[in-house]
A protein has these predicted regions:
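Alpha-helix capping and helix-loop boundary segments enriched in small/acidic/polar residues
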Residues: 11, 30-34, 199-206
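Short N-terminal binding/cap micro-motifs at the start of the first secondary-structure element
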Residues: 21-22, 30, 166-167
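Non-heme iron-sulfur electron-transfer modules
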Residues: 2, 26-59, 77-103, 366-374
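Short, charged low-complexity linear segments at domain edges
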Residues: 1-5, 34-55, 282, 290-300, ...
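Cysteine-centered iron-sulfur cluster-binding motifs in ferredoxin-type domains/subunits
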Residues: 7-26, 54, 58-78, 313
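N-terminal glycine-rich anion-binding loops that anchor highly charged ligand groups
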Residues: 18-21, 32-36, 185-186
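Iron-sulfur cluster-binding electron-transfer modules in prokaryotic oxidoreductases
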Residues: 80-378
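Short, intrinsically disordered, charge-biased short linear motifs at domain edges
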Residues: 1-10, 50-61, 180-185, 301-306
């Protein structure tokens, strides 16, 4: 089996090891094979030396959180995220390597009504204690409220799949904050639900491309696109690479994380009260991929005293579906984050990504979305 990776990108790594301290799986295991350098060595063996795609190789790749914390640390600019996505694409092409229940779950994400129905069943099952706590799910709402209303055409508010099913309150908060800075918003039309981020993580590239094309078609024009999920925002900003078209490139240039969009307009916010101290947790795809973690601090500083963690943005272990697929490693990685949160002191943690929020909340952390906190102060 050949991985079909870019030879130049794969050959860029000089094995310096500067990535190792930034890799969550290496930090908790100390295993070279579970580091970016070790995984690239395994990719090279398959790509250049026709090594067998063994069970060990699959394990090395599937245990990667895809946090991409190694990329900013790499002096050679190795595009590790793209290499891992390409490798996962090859592995996913062999259906024997992807369990049926995983494929079913990813298909549900692309069909919004099925996701909403499934979420309601999960919420009901939680009340009856039929859903195992080890799944790490937050307490899901039995009633999610009305969809986010459109107020005008200044910007698009991307609603997504999981966020719309589980966190409509955050969409309403985001719309409230946008209105407070004199920006009206509207939600995507048909097809603008799932962005395909989890599909890319799983290597289901064809499915991700199909979803991306639908999302692009759901938000025409040149209005900015505001996204309040870090994982979704990173995916939308990467559509140019995913689809390789000028239309996708132009679309990606319109995408902003919610805090990234609001920060330059912060002086317009009519703050009515200040909140207590808030600790900031940086979602990996906001910090390492979008490089948009600083605006979160700008926005939160307008309503609260911001407290920093001392772990330099190390991954929390959520990784999209990672905490469900690799619960043991995800739990070990989370323990390091919990220790850092404990040292920070304040009881409220702000996270701009649902996966991170749910993963931390499952361990008892009080997590709020930055937009929810800002809206509360208005």
């Amino acid at each position: 089996m050949k991985l079909h990776l870019d030879d130049n990108a794969l050959g860029t790594c000089v094995s310096c090891g500067l990535c190792l301290p930034h890799c969550p799986t290496f930090r908790v295991t100390g295993e070279e094979a579970l580091s970016p350098r070790g995984r690239i060595a395994a990719m090279r063996a398959v790509q250049f030396e026709s090594a067998e795609v063994s069970g060990d190789f699959v394990h090395f790749m599937e245990t990667c959180v895809q946090c991409r914390g190694c990329e900013p640390a790499c002096p050679s600019g190795v595009p590790f995220g793209q290499l891992m996505e390409g490798t996962r694409d090859t592995l996913a092409g062999n259906k024997r390597m992807t369990p049926w229940w995983q494929r079913l779950g990813y298909r549900v994400l692309g069909h919004h009504r099925l996701l909403l129905a499934g979420s309601s069943l999960l919420a009901f099952g939680q009340r009856l204690r039929l859903v195992p706590k080890r799944m790490g799910l937050p307490k899901l709402p039995l009633r999610r409220g009305a969809p986010t209303p459109s107020s005008g055409n200044d910007a698009w508010l991307f609603t997504g799949c999981v966020m719309d099913a589980w966190q409509r309150d955050t969409h309403r908060s985001t719309a409230k904050v946008l209105a407070a800075v004199d920006v009206s918003c509207r939600v995507p039309g048909s097809g603008g639900a799932c962005c395909g981020a989890l599909h890319v993580h799983a290597g289901l590239i064809d499915e991700a491309k199909s979803l991306a094309e639908r999302v692009i078609g759901s938000m025409p024009g040149d209005a900015p696109i505001v996204v309040n999920s870090a994982g979704c925002g990173a995916a939308l900003k990467d559509y140019g690479h995913l689809l390789g078209t000028s239309e996708a490139e132009e679309f990606s240039l319109r995408v902003y994380d919610a805090s990234e969009f609001v920060a330059p307009l912060i002086d317009r916010l009519p703050i009515r009260r200040r909140l207590g101290p808030v600790t900031v947790q940086d979602p990996c795809h906001l910090r390492h991929v979008q490089h948009a973690h600083l605006p979160v601090r700008t926005v939160l500083a307008a309503v609260a005293d911001v407290v920093e963690l001392d772990d330099e943005g190390l991954c929390c272990g959520a990784g999209g579906a990672y905490s469900t697929l690799q619960p043991e490693l995800a739990g070990q990685i989370r323990e390091r984050k919990l220790a850092s949160i404990g040292r920070a002191g304040p009881q409220v943690v702000a996270s701009a990504n649902p996966g991170c929020a749910y993963h931390l909340a499952a361990a008892g952390v009080h997590v709020r979305h930055p937009m929810d906190l800002v809206a509360e102060a208005l």
